[in-house]
Amino acid sequence: MALNELTLREAADKLATKEISSVELTQACLDQIAKHNPTINAFVTVDAEKALAAAQAADARIAAGNGAPLTGIPIAHKDIFNTTDMRTTCSSRMLENFIPPFDATITTHLRQAGAVILGKTNLDEFAMGSSTETSYFGASRNPWDTQRTPGGSSGGSSAAIAANMAICATGTDTGGSIRQPASLTNLTGLKPTYGRCSRYGIIAFASSLDQAGPMTRTAEDAAMLLNVMVSYDPKDSTSIQSPAPDFTQALTGDVKGLKIGIAAEYFGDGLNDEVRAAIETAQQQYQAMGAELVPISLPNSGYAIPTYYIISPAECSSNLARYDGVKFGYRCEEPKDIRDLYFRSRSEGFGDEVKRRIMLGTYVLSSGYYDAYYRKAQQARRLIADEFKAAFEKVDLILTPTSPTTAFKFGEKDDPVQMYLSDIYTINVNLAGLPGISVPCGFDSKGLPIGMQLIGRPLDEETLLRSADAYQRQTDWHKRRVHLG
């Protein structure tokens, strides 16, 4: 196996025993990027010089006996996390040349752990999309089939790992943006409990929904990366003051007696038959491992899409009001007056999908419509959260499909509503603030990956990771790799 195809655990073990060096590992990833990024378009920015310097520093740290599990590991960083030494674009013309004055808290954690940041990965503009097609820098391509999307908004991160350009990656998840791309590219993607990972220095889309998380090849890798990402941060007013365990200690391989909820609402019309079959096989495997399947009902799940597409645009319209061409970001040429500056800078700097959501958000917050839309959406959100809370009195976790289909072709979902529906199974998790993980569970007849989603109680990432890891010990779906040549 090539160095750049190693799991995070395998790479960390080889680095710790000095079987390989971080410079060798980093160079293998950089070589793969140079060879395949022109086609895959996973990275928006790559800084090979800085990456190799960080790798040399990591090797020195390991040689001195000061290494940690992430020391020397080449990682792809979603281009929504602030980095002082690299531009942070959010894949938008608005921030095309923006270099932040401070690092995101998670960026700081990665640096302190000795991780090697290879570069910044592509995403849907300001994380608004499910395919990376809204990126100002063009769509990323799925290494399993380059005519198809790697998902979104964290599609650059998922494509980078699937194409063996990085050992692991960071992502953010507002309505499924870690889990859906993980499902479409045969990866493990974890969206933690809201507030687990600091949002400080992450460019905001919808502040009550955004959450950072790991994208990796295995559940064990996700636990290792999550250990570095989770912390209480006083700079983030929504950060949870809860002790962070060593998530790798939860990986016992045992799910005997675990009660897994199966909600009929997640298996209705619109679910691809091959995806349904793969999920049902995974259910049977959990039963064979000693878990108990418990039928549950989540009838308010049907309100997920309309609720999300009222709340998230409302928050987006507020968050993106700061981009006006005055202080930072894109500025139109020769504005006639302040109104012209605002109007043209925002019209030229934002893409169509971002403008669509800003307008929708402004509308639902406007006088006369606030009560009719926004207030009702918040009430629906509470009903959805309460429904999950009641379900978790009967079960330990809930098993669903991650996405209703496998990876779709570019341009196939040109109707915005069709694109929005690709997150139908993931959005509720964000609305309720719960942790969720997508795990590889099969392939369709076209050879495209299928993912299943596990949903857990608040702050119980340990049960999710234990269950995902136990499944991966019994299956080999996650071990399958793309070989681009």
Curated annotation (Swiss-Prot):
Q: HAMAP family given for it?
A: GatA (MF_00120)
* This protein's name: Glutamyl-tRNA(Gln) amidotransferase subunit A
PANTHER family, per the entry: GLUTAMYL-TRNA(GLN) AMIDOTRANSFERASE SUBUNIT A (PTHR11895:SF151), TRANSAMIDASE (PTHR11895)
Q: Which UniProt keywords apply?
A: ATP-binding, Ligase, Nucleotide-binding, Protein biosynthesis
Relate the assembly described in the record: Heterotrimer of A, B and C subunits.
What are this entry's molecular-function GO terms?
ATP binding; glutaminyl-tRNA synthase (glutamine-hydrolyzing) activity
What is the similarity comment for this entry?
Answer: Belongs to the amidase family. GatA subfamily.
Annotated EC: 6.3.5.7
Pfam families this protein is in?
Amidase (PF01425)
Renumbered residue ranges of the record's region Disordered: 138-157
Signal peptide limits? none
Briefly, what is this protein's role? Allows the formation of correctly charged Gln-tRNA(Gln) through the transamidation of misacylated Glu-tRNA(Gln) in organisms which lack glutaminyl-tRNA synthetase. The reaction takes place in the presence of glutamine and ATP through an activated gamma-phospho-Glu-tRNA(Gln).
Which Gene3D superfamilies did the record assign?
Answer: Amidase signature (AS) domain
The question of whether Ribosomal protein is a record keyword is answered with: no
| Polar residues bias locations | 138-150
Which residues does UniProt mark as catalytic? K78, S153, S177
Protein source organism: Magnetococcus marinus (strain ATCC BAA-1437 / JCM 17883 / MC-1)
Q: Which reaction does it catalyse?
A: L-glutamyl-tRNA(Gln) + L-glutamine + ATP + H2O = L-glutaminyl-tRNA(Gln) + L-glutamate + ADP + phosphate + H(+)
Sorted alphabetically, the Gene Ontology BP terms of this entry are:
translation
